[in-house]
Amino acid sequence: GFFYVSVFGQWEPSMQTLSLVLFTAPVCFIIGLSLGVWGYLSKRVEAALQPILNVAQTMPHFSYLVPIVVLFGVGDHAGSIATIIFATPPMVRLTILGLKKISPEVIESGLMSGCNRFQLLFKVLIPTARRDILIGVNQVIMQCLAMTTIAAFIGAKGLGFNLKVALNSLKIGKAAEIGICVVIIAVVLDKLSLAWANKQKDYFANLNFYQRNRLSIFFILLTVCCSVVAFIASYFFPEGFNYLYLIPFNKGLTVSPILDAFVDWIWNTFFYYLNSFNIFLLTNVLGPMKQAYLNMPVISTFVLFMGAGYIIGGLRSCLIVGSLILFIALSEYWDRTLITLYMATFAVGVSAISGIIVGSLCSQNDFASKSILSICDFFQTFP
């Protein structure tokens, strides 16, 4: 993966993006784990966290870029703050979910073993919920890298900024190259974090410091030697280009012309089929669905959603749903809200059906499940 990044001349922006992720991801993990544990221990805290998490996850990303720019200015620090706000909620939710799934027998066994509250939390509860917490770590890494392009709008450097420039110039092939670099970083970090979390400690006694850490010492020495070689090589490469240290952007390989030609071939070959599908989808599915939502009377919408809230959560949920819909109805964005609602309903329905079918089929085979998870990582991080 890093060979691809270096050969295609994206090493420097990739390291800028990697440094951003290596700062924001641990911060998101610590904040998310702490809030998740706090929410698990206190029902009031969980009730207070739920609306905050809902707002943080559903508010459009560009909406909170403006206050961040006003309060903190532009640059990498502003991009880091925006990324932390965007990537922390999944960690909080999955921590609470994982801790809630722990059976009472596990907690009772920990208490019977003499654990105090601190030991019960860190020696029993969190290790037992490790699977869900690791999913949260995966989502944090994916969300941090997915935010790189949006953070570039407020001055964050790295692959996101280069991608924004390529898209503004309609260079599809170059944008795809940069997007693949983002995916590579995401996959590498996800696999490393998963391997570190699943690594079993070596409890064999009578091992000295070197025997316990010989691999770490070897790779540290190898890294130092390679750094020295790269520094010395700068005196031998002509024109000042040290390819052992950094491959410049204009000296790297590129497949952007091939990717541009491939996109043009798809467009020229399948234009009529794609256009026919678009027309069918607009005229027979999305168009009628949009009109049905827009023609729905306001009072019927109130009754529908408040009734659903009452059935699911009782009178309290009914009143909350009704007050929120009333706020939208009194604003000037009722029709825009219905248009957004119809698009979200269609997208959620298609995503849920396809996700359940594909996930159920792939869960029957280890190879298929690993393959589909890699594909999911690709689509979650590809800008």
Q: What does each model-identified segment do?
A:
Residues 85, 118-150, 173, 177, ...:
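Transmembrane alpha-helices
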Residues 31-38, 42, 46-49, 78-81, ...:
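Membrane-embedded alpha-helices of multi-pass transport/permease systems
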Residues 91-137:
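Short cytoplasmic-facing helical segments at TM-TM junctions of multi-pass membrane proteins
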Residues 159-196:
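Hydrophobic alpha-helical transmembrane segments of polytopic membrane proteins
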Residues 1-19, 26, 193-342, 349:
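N-terminal, non-cleaved signal-anchor transmembrane helix
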Residues 20-23, 30, 40, 53-87, ...:
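Generic hydrophobic transmembrane alpha-helix motif, especially the helices
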Residues 21, 25-37, 88, 136-145, ...:
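Hydrophobic positions within alpha-helical transmembrane segments of bacterial inner-membrane proteins
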